[in-house]
From Swiss-Prot:
Pathway: Purine metabolism; GMP biosynthesis; GMP from XMP (L-Gln route): step 1/1. The lineage of its organism: Bacteria, Pseudomonadati, Campylobacterota, Epsilonproteobacteria, Campylobacterales. This is GMP synthase [glutamine-hydrolyzing]. Homodimer. The gene is guaA. ATP binds at S217, G218, G219, V220, D221, S222, T223. Its EC number is 6.3.5.2.
């Protein structure tokens, strides 16, 4: 196992992800992790991440000096390398020769860390300070146009000024793999088949004959959680699906069919009427979210009580992922609220359940791989993200049954055409928004004054930033023609070309 000490870089999670993609398990801890906890984890090597600070700043982030007493291989990346240089007596300075973006790395000295790596390759830079003078005993391994010491080494200690974890660094994955395998002596033992077997055994032991309640949203995370639990504890799992009437077209039927194929009993609650009645007259986005969250809890509580009367429920399952865990102990300090599944926050006190989070060690891409290992269909696993409040936040203004039907039909057409054109898997997320505005149109010889629909499609890797998708005009024209001809009440279609930032992916 490789342990990554997080100094606040926006790329820290990528380090662990790249290593895991190579079959090497990696964990992330804050830079101030105690030496006792580091020793308990028994890593075979340490990676010091990048960070936004300068090593010579008064409040510069610094780990325990005792990490050097562990006699472990260490790799410093960007700030991590500069910290190593400063700690061992070298010179780091702020110059006018900052580097951001792509640069050419040229290897000047053979090293095990560069085994099988091209002499010249593209790398990703993001630094203002640079190493001016190496500490005694260190050797320069590579350079870039603005960094004479772009990679350094001293026995088992290495430094890289660039970010190997970023996809733009052509040989970055290989370099990280070399450090883990050739320097640290790790083995490729990490994978979803191994994880599934290990986690099911752990769940069986922990839960024994107790009952577990699991809220199913129809999304990937909750479906994978339910499937993993059912494999481990069979009918002691109580899976609950609340249909709030704000789902995509045919969504309920798809979820029910999926769970039937997986042979998992699913308790479906039809709560459409109560949700719509509580949303009547409400236009403000945050109030809509609040009402949906509270109403979900009421519906979930009612169903949970039924099962609780039949036999005490001891556990509640949630789809917490590893990024949520990392954020809760980041270098910014523990979060005030640990992010949880939108459906299960704020449960009443009588639901005094023990928490089970089977996916808390996994990144989103690993959850999909686990789902595949568990036999969940690829089409389902690769579906675009869908918000917890559903179509309520894609209908601007008040929500009504007629608006929901209108949006469902338009959205169905957009997604259907994306799939026909083999574009669905090429965009990160795509959907329609029903705008709270009417416009004048002409249908035949008649004047119309009807709703406008906005098409939204974005490219992203994790949703933190996104750019709008460049869809061909002919494709957009086809979608527009179908929507205006097939969906009653729509006479205008527009395409959103806003990136994030400055906009958000969802409109509300």
């Amino acid at each position: 196992m490789i342990l990554v000490l997080d100094f606040g870089s926006q790329y820290t999670q990528l380090i662990a992800r790249r290593l895991r993609e190579s079959g090497i398990y990696a964990e992330i801890v804050p830079f101030f992790e105690s030496i006792e906890n580091i020793q308990k984890k028994a890593p075979k090597g340490l990676i010091l991440s990048g960070g936004p600070a300068s090593v010579y700043a008064k409040d510069a982030y610094k780990p325990s000096k005792k990490i050097f007493d562990l006699d472990l291989p260490i790799l410093g990346i960007c700030y991590g390398m500069q910290y190593l240089v400063d700690f061992f007596g070298g010179v780091v300075a702020c110059t006018n020769e900052q580097e951001f973006g792509k640069a050419i790395l040229e290897i000047t000295q053979d090293s095990v860390i560069f085994e099988g790596v091209k002499i010249k390759s593209l790398v990703w830079m993001s630094h203002m300070d640079k190493v001016i003078e190496l500490p005694k005993g260190f050797t320069t391994l590579a350079k870039s146009p603005n960094s004479p010491h772009c990679a350094i080494e001293n026995a088992k200690i290495f430094g890289l000024q660039f970010h190997p974890e970023v996809i733009q660094s052509e040989e970055g994955g290989k370099i990280l793999e070399n450090f883990a395998l050739l320097v640290c002596g790790c083995e490729k033992t990490w994978g979803m088949q191994h994880f599934a077997q290990k986690e099911m055994a752990r769940l069986k032991e922990k839960i024994a004959n107790a009952k577990v309640l699991c809220a199913v949203s129809g999304g990937v995370d909750s479906t994978v959680v339910a499937t993993l639990l059912h494999r481990a504890i069979k009918d002691n799992l109580i899976a609950v699906f609340v249909d709030h009437g704000l789902l995509r077209k045919n969504e309920k039927e798809k979820v029910q069919a999926m769970f039937k194929d997986l042979q998992i009993p699913l308790n479906t609650i039809d709560a459409k009427e109560i949700f719509l009645s509580k949303l009547k007259g409400v236009s403000e986005p945050e109030l809509k979210r609040k009402i949906i969250g509270e109403t979900f809890i009421e519906a979930f509580e009612k169903e949970a009580k039924k099962h609780h009367l039949k036999g005490k429920i001891e556990f509640l399952a949630q789809g917490t992922l590893y990024p949520d865990v990392i954020e809760s102990v980041s270098v910014k300090g523990p979060s005030k609220v640990i992010k949880t599944h939108h459906n299960v926050g704020g449960l009443p006190e009588w639901m005094d359940f023990k928490l089970i989070e089977p996916l808390r060690e996994l990144f989103k891409d690993e959850v999909r791989l686990l789902g595949k290992e568990l036999g969940i269909s690829q089409d389902f696993l690769m579906r675009h993200p869908f918000p917890g409040p559903g179509l309520a936040i894609r209908i601007l203004g008040e929500v009504s049954e007629s608006k929901i039907r209108c949006l469902q039909e338009a959205d169905f057409i957009f997604i259907e055409e994306l799939k026909k054109a083999n574009l669905y898997d090429k965009v990160w997320q795509a959907f329609c928004v029903l705008l709270n505005v009417n416009s004048v149109g002409v249908m035949g010889d008649n004047r119309t004054y009807e709703n406008a629909i906005c098409l939204r499609a974005v490219n992203a890797s994790d949703g933190m930033t996104a750019s709008f998708s460049f869809l061909e005009h002919s494709f957009l024209e086809k979608v527009s023609n179908r929507i205006t001809n097939e969906v009653s009440g729509i006479n205008r279609v527009v395409y959103d070309i806003t990136s994030k930032p400055p906009g958000t992916i969802e409109w509300e």
